Amino acid sequence: MEFSVKSGSPEKQRSACIVVGVFEPRRLSPIAEQLDKISDGYISALLRRGELEGKPGQTLLLHHVPNVLSERILLIGCGKERELDERQYKQVIQKTINTLNDTGSMEAVCFLTELHVKGRNNYWKVRQAVETAKETLYSFDQLKTNKSEPRRPLRKMVFNVPTRRELTSGERAILHGLAIAAAIKAAKDLGNMPPNICNAAYLASQARQLADSYSKNVITRVIGEQQMKELGMHSYLAVGQGSQNESLMSVIEYKGNASEDARPIVLVGKGLTFDSGGISIKPSEGMDEMKYDMCGAAAVYGVMRMVAELQLPINVIGVLAGCENMPGGRAYRPGDVLTTMSGQTVEVLNTDAEGRLVLCDVLTYVERFEPEAVIDVATLTGACVIALGHHITGLMANHNPLAHELIAASEQSGDRAWRLPLGDEYQEQLESNFADMANIGGRPGGAITAGCFLSRFTRKYNWAHLDIAGTAWRSGKAKGATGRPVALLAQFLLNRAGFNGEE
């Protein structure tokens, strides 16, 4: 789908469709008022007859409106003007895209960017419209034999901005929006792949392809089990030893700043391509969704794609920690004591608390990059779902400025996160009689004790942890990967690169 931006009055638009907003109760937006004036009150007369109230989600498609060059006008209900916020704006865009796609409008000029969203500028409105449009049109049908497509799908969308001064920021918004949307799609595609296809080797192949596509700035190295053994990554290796699929760690390095003192930002993604729970096996109900236990790695992959596509002037390293947790004669057991790459020992009390055992070795491994900051992304704990539900990602950090940056990026992008504490009191729950620590700390504060466990391996750099167990995928009828927190991380990196969304 093609996007562009221009500045022009509605009466001069010659398009298949013009999209404008209507507020409750039956109040036209400024552009809709202009069209009403041109058409000698045609639109307002329809509203007076009760054709459209302006409630959120309502639509009215008008054909051959008098004195208007475009074939059709789509009126979209936007609710009460004062109540229009970021969430409702995205819902209005989503409804617009679905209606245009369903009614065969192959192209449209959208004036919804005129809507006032408190604290948001035209760059934000255009970029969010692009991201929302791509999200709305997303489908995962690679493995279906019968693919259903609209007869006349929407192919072109033009966003109107008030004056020519906003054209540059509008074009940048489209550029950024398309790159982020492609990153989200890449993460969702990886997450939705079945575990018999998407294993650690598949993740590694995707990482290599990324380096092939962006060879100017990206190199990929894949570290196998033999090299992990030589590095002392015994905790990571233990998790995968019950599987026939080799554990592989893919390291994607993007260099956008050649300065010698430009330290990299490191992103670490948990990549459990299937998590049965191991010997501490999970219940069978919903176990199919454990293919989503690699959504952290999928998100990191997507973000690395976005960074390379936009050629951001920063250095970023993405690590995909590929692994599979299976029961079997070679599987690790409750009661085992593992020696991590850091030299610290861990008593395994539950083999289903495996993500932290993989991540702890990767967090030690990335010390060699002397990072500016390290952010790990993981579907880590069911406890985080209990704490925050499915709407907000859990955030923990050992560095307040980094945490504040991530929270700000989450608010800017609409991909929200909430900070949880990392108090010393919680560390006591990880005490073990037989090792330096246990891999679980009991039910109370389970998301926090998991973060506390990881914090013991991050003392040499600024670190943040994103627990996406509640936000990485949806269950039920709309089952599928969400691509989160790609938008959050993308905004964080755009901010670091100096693109903070100002006009």
From Swiss-Prot:
The active site is at 282, 356. One of its GO terms (cellular component) is cytoplasm. Mn(2+) 2 binds at residues 270, 275, 293, 354. InterPro entries: Leucine_aapep/pepB, Macro_dom-like, Peptidase_M17_C, Peptidase_M17_leu_NH2_pept, Peptidase_M17_N. It holds the Pfam family Peptidase_M17. Its cofactor is Mn(2+). The keyword Hydrolase applies. PROSITE patterns: CYTOSOL_AP. CDD domains: Peptidase_M17 (cd00433). GO terms for biological process: proteolysis. The keyword DNA repair does not apply. It is an enzyme of class 3 (hydrolase). GO terms for molecular function: manganese ion binding; metalloaminopeptidase activity. It comes from the Bacteria. Its EC number is 3.4.11.1, 3.4.11.10. It is found in: Cytoplasm. It catalyses: Release of an N-terminal amino acid, Xaa-|-Yaa-, in which Xaa is preferably Leu, but may be other amino acids including Pro although not Arg or Lys, and Yaa may be Pro. Amino acid amides and methyl esters are also readily hydrolyzed, but rates on arylamides are exceedingly low; Release of an N-terminal amino acid, preferentially leucine, but not glutamic or aspartic acids. Binds 2 manganese ions per subunit. Keywords: Aminopeptidase, Cytoplasm, Hydrolase, Manganese, Metal-binding, Protease. Mn(2+) 1 binds at residues 275, 352, 354. Belongs to the peptidase M17 family. HAMAP family: Cytosol_peptidase_M17 (MF_00181). Presumably involved in the processing and regular turnover of intracellular proteins. Catalyzes the removal of unsubstituted N-terminal amino acids from various peptides. NCBIfam families: PRK00913.1-1, PRK00913.1-2, PRK00913.1-4. This is Probable cytosol aminopeptidase. It comes from Shigella boydii serotype 18 (strain CDC 3083-94 / BS512).
